[in-house]
Amino acid sequence: MTKIKLLILAVVMAVSSMPIFSAVVQGQELATTPLAKPKVIFFDVNETLLDLNNVSKSIATALDGREDLVPYWFTTMLHYSLVANVTGQYNSFVEIGIASLEMIAKQKNIALTSQQARTAVLTPFRDLAPHKDVVKGLKQLRALGYTLITLTNSSDAGIAAQLKNANLAQYFDGSLTVQNLATFKPDLKVYHWAQQQMNIAPQDAMLIAAHA
């Protein structure tokens, strides 16, 4: 499903007063409850709002043009973020990405300095363009009066730079990051914490996320 379809789905689900699905068990239709309009819509940022192609190109370049290693780097970064959740040894998402890149370069006998790895990860992550349908979708949601909040594994400084460089800051009412919580999504405590920060019940929230 494309990003804009997900955004439109959020609008349709939120404003509709009709059930969006029904279930049939042993020939009997089950009662459904209409979805309530959310008070807050949380947005994942990387991939959902921002195009990661520049990151992929930068990582491939750092790994001697090995585009086939980019998915390995990304899954390695995600793996160690989950390990950090379990062990309680938090490092920023970017730092994990840098360490993962250095590790893969060493595994594949690719010459890469620590500074080169840092530049390859940090520079493109801070300067990502939004997907072409994102601004239109955000404008539609703003026009409908929704409170829009980013919820990201990035640091406070990271999300501030990303939204500024992508010209998206104007569409959001605030940003929440895992920096102070020191726990990465998709740990359930992140979503509970975000709900508490906005002082809303779970049924009053909606999360928009699209991961390839």
Language-model segments: residues:
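An amphipathic alpha-helix signature
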Residues: S56, V70, F74, V94-E102, ...
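Substrate-recognition "cap/lid" segment bordering the active-site pocket of phosphatases
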Residues: I149, D156-M206
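A metal-dependent, Asp-based hydrolase signature
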Residues: S81-T119
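Substrate-recognition element of Asp-dependent hydrolases with the DxDx(T/V) motif
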Residues: Q115-D127, V134-L163, G174-V178
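Non-catalytic pre-domain segments flanking phosphatase-related domains
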Residues: T2-V11, M18-F43
